[in-house]
UniProtKB/Swiss-Prot annotation:
Protein name as it appears in the record: Pyridoxal phosphate phosphatase PHOSPHO2
Entry keyword set: Hydrolase, Magnesium, Metal-binding, Pyridoxal phosphate
Enzyme class: hydrolase
UniProt xrefs under Pfam families: Put_Phosphatase (PF06888)
UniProt-recorded Gene Ontology molecular function terms: metal ion binding; pyridoxal phosphatase activity
EC number(s) recorded for this UniProt protein: 3.1.3.74
Lineage, highest ranks first: Eukaryota, Metazoa, Chordata, Craniata, Vertebrata
UniProt keyword annotation of Phosphoprotein present: no
Amino acid sequence: MKVLLVFDFDNTIIDDNSDTWIVQCAPDKKLPIELQDSYQKGLWTEFMGRVFKYLRDEGVKADELKRAVTSLPFTSGMIELLSFLRMNKDRFDCIIISDSNSIFIDWVLEAAAFHDVFDHVFTNPASFDSSGRLTVKNYHAHSCTRCPKNLCKNTVLGEFIDKQLQKGVRYTRIVYIGDGGNDVCPVTFLKKNDVAMPREGYTLHRTLAKMSQNLEPMESSIVVWSSGVEIISHLQFLIKM
């Protein structure tokens, strides 16, 4: 049986937020104040829809967005980690669950030739309309009160595990690699053999530390990382167990 690796994308695989990164395509590399102030909590995808409309209205073309997105740096050690996983696909299945969008993730994975590492990518579907505007839809509707309106990562992970079980695929454990507040929900549902891997110093790490102080126990083990090379070391340890 394999290990399932679940990756976030922004600030995990890549070392920034792809949505905020493309603001560099705007005039003077910033958004108008009224557009910045239009964000409402939990409605990030709707906000980004307005950002993409503004960029289109300012004459920003798809190839400019692509140049910006594919210039995003990978997080330290992540290229080494993804290369390690490619060489060990017999031991690991890898999926991405991300609040970014399908076009940005495709661009990054294609430019770096890492598409083959991942078995599935779950994210907000995106496309360019006839006017050249990038449009992004919510991934799904859900009833989770802890997550943004467009995506509950725990629901997505649970549905994926169920579908794999229906195909007769079981995993020895789940390793969840992430950084953000929207990674808290799926991580808290991990089981005893599973591993939560929060990026050091980021929201997920701080939240799990606070939960520990408040004696809110988690079933899974927690392994903090700051480089993909550290993740490789832990995965090598797991497959030797």
